[in-house]
Amino acid sequence: MIELHGWLSIVETYKNEDFIPQEEIEKIQEQVKFIIQNNTCDLEILYQNGTPFLNTLVCCNHNTTQAKQIIEVYTKISEIATGSYGMIYVWDDEDKNYYNHFQTYIFKKGQCEYKIDTNFSPCIPTIEDAFID
């Protein structure tokens, strides 16, 4: 089983927007729209109080390329719209190395940082008991 939870607040820059030409802001917005329009994961930009964001949940019996593609989309957007911030949590119990751990992808200031989560991991016994036959 794979479980992916992700969110990304989309912000054009982490720098002072007053010093960035409007044309540059619009170019960033267009690039983000292009990424979303051309993704194969059915991601779409949502808005709350005028702020664009992504909110993603995937729960599948087996890992597919979808999780990797979602991480790639979040990464591309955060590299272009460098003020974007958010995270993705992934638990893939078929992953040979991390089957018992949540893996996190943290997005901030145009970077994606990968870490093994310590809040829910190891998943057994932190969030589930071991099954005994």
Spans of features found by a protein language model:
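Short, extreme N-terminal segment that most often corresponds to the first beta-strand
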Residues: 1-29
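Beta-strand-enriched cores of mature, soluble protein domains
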Residues: 4, 41-45, 89
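A structural detector for beta-sheet-dominated domains
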Residues: 9-11, 46, 57-59, 89-91
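Short, surface-exposed beta-strand/loop "edge" segments at domain boundaries and coil↔beta transitions
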Residues: 14-17, 62-68, 94-101
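Ampiphathic alpha-helical segments that act as solvent-exposed interaction surfaces
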Residues: 24-25, 69-85, 122-133
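Short, intrinsically disordered low-complexity segments
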Residues: 29-75, 79-84
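A short amphipathic beta-strand at an alpha->beta junction
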Residues: 83-96
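Acidic, proline/glycine-rich low-complexity IDRs
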Residues: 95-133
